[in-house]
């Protein structure tokens, strides 16, 4: 079969890779002629390349890529058209929906699997992994995935896998920017909300708009909400059933009140699915932090709290629990001004030292300027490399606590990996 991929952002690239892995012919296109194709990992000797000033065409094996233009004949001759979730609601998405060419309308086995969606601003990935481990320990075969930008292989990969093997449960992490897309592509039996926070405001514009999108998503479905969730009456009013969850009361290896809530949500869903209490308790008490998410390492006299906190609410959830001598913050993309609110809160918190490193983009100058505008008078350091970060951590490692967060999941994972080596070598694992 043949798939046409329109748009080569993170989701489009991963969709292309997934289709190829399932032995499909793939036509991939993007109007941006500067898309980085290195993610496809194709040896240059195997590529037929045609290039002019504005357009690039590449053919290799089962893959054809056009950049700067698209070939209508290639798209129309495809069995399936895969659009970026960000294109949902556009005229082109509507066209292929009406033609029945969207993947979820061609391959439909995934719609027969009991499907759980986890959405919200923070805590989705940790909750998904907690629940996955509980379900697998109880003997269920679980397929897990979600938004490609969140570290998974993408929504299309989920559908392809669900149509090639048998599973008991489909567990989907749903990005708050893809609610309408996922509502059409998946048949959710249960939806859960971790929380509502101030993120992706460049898309939602206001919390009220985000709330309204969630109400549409929850309409007619069974939902799981925190017992004190904002807008609870609105959500309950549109849902067919609402189940509350509370903080987990047992012991956890992972730190923080936010993780007690994540564990509480996983517990509520597992209880709904009639998983025995002893399995839930045993799995959660031994649950290890997800890569890139909040973890704690000991280095000399200091405890280092590190994890992606790419919005102001995630950052505050950490700052409100501990007194940190230094905070290391990864910077956002140049156009993500709403994420600079993280800096506003760091300035109010006023640690002795702020260390800035490039997270998603080299926007350190923008961050420094924001600190100056806020009249932060502590010490500001710039870390241009991983070695710079480790050097500064060593300098501060006799203080009680250090926080590393902000934007840039891949960079934060690299720091975690280096910290673990240092911590293990010092025989000081937390």
Language-model segment annotations:
Residues 3, 81, 115-116, 142, ...:
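Conserved hydrophobic helix-helix packing surfaces used for dimerization/oligomerization
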Residues 1-117:
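Short, basic phosphate-binding NTP loop
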Residues 19, 81, 118, 173, ...:
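Residue-level signal for inorganic ion chemistry
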């Amino acid at each position: 079969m043949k798939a046409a991929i329109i748009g080569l952002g993170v989701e489009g690239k991963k969709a292309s890779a997934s289709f190829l892995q399932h032995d499909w012919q793939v036509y991939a296109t993007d109007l941006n002629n500067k898309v980085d194709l290195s993610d496809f990992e194709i040896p240059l000797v195997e590529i037929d390349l045609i290039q002019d000033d504005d357009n690039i065409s590449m053919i290799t094996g089962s893959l054809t890529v056009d950049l700067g233009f698209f070939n209508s004949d290639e798209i129309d001759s495809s069995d399936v058209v895969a659009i970026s979730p960000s294109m949902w609601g556009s005229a082109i998405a509507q066209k292929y929906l009406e033609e029945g060419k969207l993947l979820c309308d061609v391959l439909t086995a995934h719609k027969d699997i009991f499907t759980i969606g986890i959405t919200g601003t923070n805590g989705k990935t940790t909750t998904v992994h907690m629940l996955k481990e509980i379900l697998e320990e109880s003997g269920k075969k679980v397929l897990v995935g979600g938004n490609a930008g969140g570290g998974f292989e993408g929504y299309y990969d989920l559908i392809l896998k669900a149509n090639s093997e048998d599973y008991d449960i489909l567990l989907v992490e749903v990005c708050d920017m893809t609610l309408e897309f996922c509502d059409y592509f998946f048949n959710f039996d249960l939806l859960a909300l971790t929380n509502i926070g101030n993120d992706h405001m460049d898309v939602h514009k206001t919390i009220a708009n985000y709330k309204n999108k969630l109400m549409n998503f929850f309409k007619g479905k069974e939902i799981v909400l925190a017992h004190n969730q904002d807008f609870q009456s609105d959500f309950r009013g549109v849902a067919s059933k609402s189940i509350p969850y509370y903080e987990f009361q047992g012991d956890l290896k992972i730190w923080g009140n936010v993780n007690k809530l994540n564990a509480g949500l996983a517990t509520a869903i597992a209880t709904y699915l009639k998983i025995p209490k002893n399995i839930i308790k045993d799995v959660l008490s031994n649950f290890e932090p997800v890569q890139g998410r909040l973890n704690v390492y000991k280095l000399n006299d200091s405890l280092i709290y590190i994890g992606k906190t790419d919005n102001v609410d995630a950052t505050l959830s950490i700052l409100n629990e501990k007194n940190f001598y230094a905070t290391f913050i990864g910077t956002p993309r140049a156009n993500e001004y709403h994420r600079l609110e993280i800096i506003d809160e760091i300035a109010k918190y006023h640690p002795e030292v702020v260390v800035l490193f490039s997270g998603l983009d080299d926007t350190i100058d923008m961050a420094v300027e924001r600190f100056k505008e806020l009249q932060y008078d502590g010490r500001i350091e710039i870390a241009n490399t991983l070695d710079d970060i480790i050097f500064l951590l060593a300098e501060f490692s006799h203080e009680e606590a250090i926080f590393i967060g902000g934007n840039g999941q891949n960079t934060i994972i690299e720091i975690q990996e280096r910290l673990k080596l240092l911590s293990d070598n010092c025989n000081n694992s937390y």
